[in-house]
Regions:
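Beta-strand signatures of extracellular beta-sandwich domains
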Residues: 58-62, 116-118
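Short beta-strand elements of extracellular/lumenal beta-sandwich folds
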Residues: 37-48
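Short solvent-exposed strand-capping/beta-turn motif centered on an Asx-Ser/Thr pair
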Residues: 47-52, 108
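C-terminal interaction-tip segments
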Residues: 2-38, 99-100, 106-123
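Intrinsically disordered, low-complexity Pro/Gly/Ser/Thr-rich segments with frequent PxxP/GP/PP motifs
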Residues: 65-100
């Protein structure tokens, strides 16, 4: 099924998700699998460093589900100071995830960063 026509959407549900970057590999933050029949509109995405030390963070849009395919960096290896938050996406720079797209994040040190994402599930 194709992603919905946004004008003809029958449901828009506000959601928030959280992800711990438990490794230094790319981790799926938000996923819209093929055949979902949905479009996900990302309103905000924040990265929080939960330690006292600087951690470098990369956040990217992927042209396949589950951080597959090619990554297109939204922010690349940005240093996040200890006990600080980086606002990566906000209402002035929203992203749409069509079917078979995802957002992923990577931290330079495992178990030091959490990512929260507020989005609209449109179908």
């Amino acid at each position: 099924m194709a992603a919905p026509n946004l004008i003809g959407a029958t449901a828009i549900i506000g959601k928030t998700s959280g992800t711990n970057l438990s490794s230094t590999n790319a981790t799926t933050v938000l996923n819209n699998p093929a055949g979902s029949g949905k479009c996900l509109k990302i309103n905000t995405l924040n990265v929080a460093n939960t330690t006292n030390s600087v951690v470098n963070v990369t956040v990217g849009w992927y042209d396949a589900a589950s951080v597959g395919g090619t990554q297109y960096k939204i922010v690349g290896s940005v240093p996040v100071p200890g006990n600080s938050t980086l606002n990566v996406i906000d209402k002035s720079s929203q992203y749409y995830l069509e079917e078979n797209n995802s957002i992923g994040a990577t931290a330079s040190v495992a178990d030091t960063v959490t990512v929260t994402c507020s989005y609209e599930d449109i179908s």
